[in-house]
UniProtKB/Swiss-Prot annotation:
Name of the protein: Alpha-conotoxin GIB
Additional remark text: Both the globular (with C1-C3; C2-C4 disulfide pattern) and ribbon (C1-C4; C2-C3) isomers shows no or very weak activity on alpha-3-beta-2/CHRNA3-CHRNB2, alpha-3-beta-4/CHRNA3-CHRNB4, and alpha-4-beta-2/CHRNA4-CHRNB2.
UniProt keyword annotations, A-Z: Acetylcholine receptor inhibiting toxin, Amidation, Cleavage on pair of basic residues, Disulfide bond, Neurotoxin, Postsynaptic neurotoxin, Secreted, Signal, Toxin
Record comment regarding domains: The cysteine framework is I (CC-C-C). Alpha3/5 pattern.
Residue positions where Glycine amide is found in the record: G64
Main localization, broad class: secreted
Family: Belongs to the conotoxin A superfamily.
């Protein structure tokens, strides 16, 4: 391949990567907000020494009945 062809392929790859990355970043913003909300809910339960999540259930009791 010539230098022009290699440069053209490089530009196409960069453009395709940029176009593909935009929708995934927008979609992750909403999920991050939800994860932060769930994390704060978990912190509130841990403060009460109560947690039904399997990640913290072995250290705290689960009175919620989950």
């Amino acid at each position: 391949m010539g230098m022009r062809m290699m440069f053209t392929v490089f530009l196409l790859v960069v453009l395709a990567t940029t176009v593909v990355s935009f929708p995934s970043e927008r979609a992750s913003d909403g999920r991050d907000d939800t994860a932060k909300d769930e994390g704060s809910d978990m912190e509130k339960l841990v403060e009460k020494k109560e947690c039904c999540n399997p990640a913290c259930g072995r250290h705290y009791s689960c009175k919620g009945g989950r």
